[in-house]
Amino acid sequence: MLYFVNFGMPDHKSGIEHAELKRLQLFEDHQLPCKIIARDWNRTLHMTANAAGVDDDHLLGMFDYYQHTEKVVSKHLTVADLDFGLQNLTTQDESEKHRYIVKRKNGAMVARVNYDDQHGRQVISTEMFDGYGNLYCVNFYDSRGFKSLIQWYSPDNKIDNEEWVTPDGKTVIRDYYKKDVHGKLTKTGWWLSDHQGIIHQFATIDRLFEFFLNQVNGEGGNIFILDRSLLADDALTRLKKPAYTVMHLHNSQAGDAQNPLHSILNNNYEYALNNINKYSAIVSATQRQTDDVIARFHPTSKTFTIPVGIVPDKVLQAPRITEAKRTFGKVVAVARVAPEKRLDHLVRAINEVHKQVPEVTLDIYGYYDPTNKYEAKRKVEDLTKKYHLEGIVNLKGYTNDVASVYNDAQIFGLTSVMEGFDLAIMEAISHGVVGVTYDVNYGPNDIIQDGKNGYVVDFNDWHAIADRMLELFKNPQLMQKMSDGAYESANRYSPDSVWQNWNKLLTDAKQTLKGSEK
């Protein structure tokens, strides 16, 4: 079995989740058994995974595993289905707060029932109160309609411990909160009752997850692809039975991606890189990154270059949209609105372009990173006001329909500090969008081939970004030529092409695991 290790499958996905989904589809197409492992508990895990095309057969949640809820028939649970063990209760709807208030006949509160307006008022949680009006516990319900997590509260209204239960109410996992030396409430331990009823205790969720991975690995012979390094970078080096372990680099291994051989390490990969030879293989998305990893760390583990992006055949074979049918002047960026994306650089470039091409617009699609009180979003908004670009620069938020965005755009702009591949710019060229990017490691400076499907300009030179955009907007023939080049260059990421790269790794895994049996 192949396992892709992650924390979950959220509704708003990062490039890592999108890469997993593409890989899952590719492996399914080649009849390979595979599952996404989700370490963290989330009441909507199955709902969001199913919506993304991951059925329950291809999803393995750690909490599901112990709660016996890997496959459960869904039930639409509403307030009418709840039993509070009392009679003569009244229910008041506070629709503006998305909840019901449940009271005794004398007006004393029994519970607050929080519901999901987007899914027929399905119950999310119940906040339970004692006879003195004190909150004593909160019950969280899985989106499939059963109680899954109970949070117990202390007299000072803090979470004291949490329990995860089976659908029939048996507690199988607990965690505990205690005050540290500074008086701060801290999670101090985990308790597990495994499938045989044996009790185990762990100091951290990392140790619990390590135990779980060893149980999943069983007698060995499995392949684990670690997509979120910090979740199991050490655990995968301590599996008790043979397995083929893959450290997948989804971002720059260096803190300064432009100085990969000498800068401090990206803290997300620090442990893994310092223990690089404890993994069976290392995967990078570009040859440039693979070469840099080899040059700095000299691994004896196998290294493979495998693009994380896959362009479906139906996209490669779709009718091409000419520049004449696109909105003239439309520039797009599809990325988290986060500090490392430096979208303010792109706004500065658009301001320069607008002086000569008044039709230009910049539409930014992506969810807003809350770091430093949404600093990146505020920078874009502040520059938009400073340059009087209201209605020209537009923050559009997250979208699930990027195809429509790309099919109407002429240019994709990218000004990041670093990337691990950048699925968005790969998807953009597959729709004929011309890329204009900084010479940034890793991905954009490989996906965009300077002079063929766009332009790669000097790092940090937003003036050059503006100049290249102006060159394209002022020369329709050049824009069309570059768009044609974009369509053609996307064939590098066809399913067949990417599969050939994965097949090399899988062949090595088969040989390695066969050797471990001797």
Regions inferred by a protein language model and the residue ranges of each:
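A short, active-site helix/loop in glycosyltransferases that binds the activated sugar's phosphate group
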Residues: N275-T303
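Acidic anion/phosphate-binding donor-loop and adjacent secondary structure
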Residues: A257-P260, G309-F328
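Aromatic "clamp/platform" in nucleotide-sugar-dependent glycosyltransferases that forms part
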Residues: Y398, V417
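A short, well-ordered alpha-helix in the C-terminal region of glycosyltransferases
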Residues: V405, A464, L478-R492, N501-K504
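Conserved acidic donor-binding segment of nucleotide-sugar-dependent glycosyltransferases
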Residues: Q449-G451, Y455-W462, L470-Q477, N491
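Short hydrophobic beta-strand element within catalytic cores of glycosyltransferases
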Residues: V434-Y438
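Nucleotide-activated donor-binding/catalytic signature segment of Leloir-type glycosyltransferases, i.e.
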Residues: K377-G397
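Conserved donor-binding/catalytic core segment of Leloir-type glycosyltransferases
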Residues: T322-K341, V347-I350
